[in-house]
Regions:
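Sigma70-family region 2
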Residues: 4, 41-58, 77-78
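Arg/Lys-rich amphipathic alpha helix in sigma70-family domain 2
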Residues: 65-82
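Amphipathic alpha-helical interaction elements
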Residues: 27-31, 52-55
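Conserved RNAP core-binding helix
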Residues: 15, 23, 33-49
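Amphipathic alpha-helical recognition patches that constitute DNA-binding helices
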Residues: 10, 21, 25, 35, ...
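A short, charge-rich alpha-helical start-of-domain segment used by transcription regulators
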Residues: 1-24, 28
Length: 82
């Protein structure tokens, strides 16, 4: 339980310290506030589910890469629908 509490605190700091930057990064690709929030939240969910594996890596870089890839995928998907 202490381990999960520690991870929760680390993740909370990661979230509060990086959410805004990731949101604006996604928004540059998507120009849609709601979709940008969804993309960023998906990236954080991915990291949370795999946090044990990522702890020794540059998690912020993983988040930016995840947001970038998801933003590009979403942009392409939206273009096809138009």
């Amino acid at each position: 339980m202490l381990k999960s509490l520690r991870y929760g605190k680390e993740f909370e700091e990661l979230y509060t310290g990086n959410y805004s930057r990731l949101y604006y990064y996604a928004y540059q690709f998507l120009n849609d506030a709601e979709v940008s929030r969804d993309v960023v939240n998906d990236a954080f969910e991915y990291v949370w589910k795999n946090y044990e594996n990522f702890r020794k890596m540059n998690v912020v870089a993983i988040l930016f890469l995840s947001v970038r890839n998801k933003s590009i995928d979403t942009f392409r998907h939206n273009k096809v629908e138009e």
